[in-house]
């Protein structure tokens, strides 16, 4: 059984893949700009492209990427192939392209969360986002809120990712007072002076994400064929 360091039960969804494929595309866009003699710093590049995603169609205009650099146990893949597919009448714009890659970055995670939220009746008051996905303010946060249909909060430390969270757990084990719960320690010792920003899910984004996921699940056979035939 998985628990927090103070013994509280944990429901955990783990996915293998997230933004590796998206990062590869961002680097391709950087290479394209540099071919024209344009230099752009990393934060500006990511910020501009991530924010572009907010201009896209709610369902990503019919685009379908998979970010499977490796296998994904949630969808029963032992190997992965990053790929991008569309139909002739898909709305192939930069905004939809970026939006679809942000959506698919948490696609497998959403499938796992749907089991907890829709099948097992788990109720989420809010999520606290950490990691590079949330580094561009408001974008990954808005996408995640749509994915889980729940408010998502981020703090200034959001970009620090998992290593920061692990350090907090270690600090709790070392510094907690007798009987002090992890929740109390985090609230009173760690987050008391930290400002957070919360974004509620936009119903149109939620509906769009569900439509994207219908396409995602239907297209898994495309990914499976790529694993078999692309070497």
Region locations from a protein language model:
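Active-site core segments that coordinate phosphate-bearing ligands/cofactors
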Residues: 1-128, 133-231
């Amino acid at each position: 059984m998985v628990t927090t360091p103070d013994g509280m039960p944990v429901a955990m969804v783990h996915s293998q893949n997230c933004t590796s494929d998206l990062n590869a595309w961002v680097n391709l866009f950087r290479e394209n700009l540099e071919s024209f003699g344009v230099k752009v710093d990393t934060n500006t590049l990511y910020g501009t492209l991530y924010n572009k995603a907010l201009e896209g169609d709610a369902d990503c205009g019919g685009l379908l990427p998979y970010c499977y650099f490796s296998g994904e146990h949630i969808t029963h893949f032992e190997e992965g192939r990053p790929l991008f597919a569309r139909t002739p009448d898909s709305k192939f714009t930069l905004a939809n392209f970026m939006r679809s890659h942000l959506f698919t970055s948490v696609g497998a995670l959403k499938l796992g969360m749907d089991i907890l939220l829709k099948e097992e009746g788990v109720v989420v008051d809010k999520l606290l986002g950490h990691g590079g996905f949330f580094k561009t303010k408001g974008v990954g946060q808005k996408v995640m809120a749509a994915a889980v249909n729940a408010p998502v909060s981020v703090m200034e430390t959001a970009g620090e990712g998992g290593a920061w969270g692990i350090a907090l757990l270690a600090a709790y084990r070392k510094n907690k007072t007798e009987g002090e719960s992890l929740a109390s320690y985090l609230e009173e010792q760690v987050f008391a002076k930290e400002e957070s920003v919360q974004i509620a899910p936009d119903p149109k984004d939620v509906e769009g994400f569900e439509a994207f996921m219908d396409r995602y699940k239907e297209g898994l056979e495309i990914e499976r064929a790529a694993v078999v035939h692309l070497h």
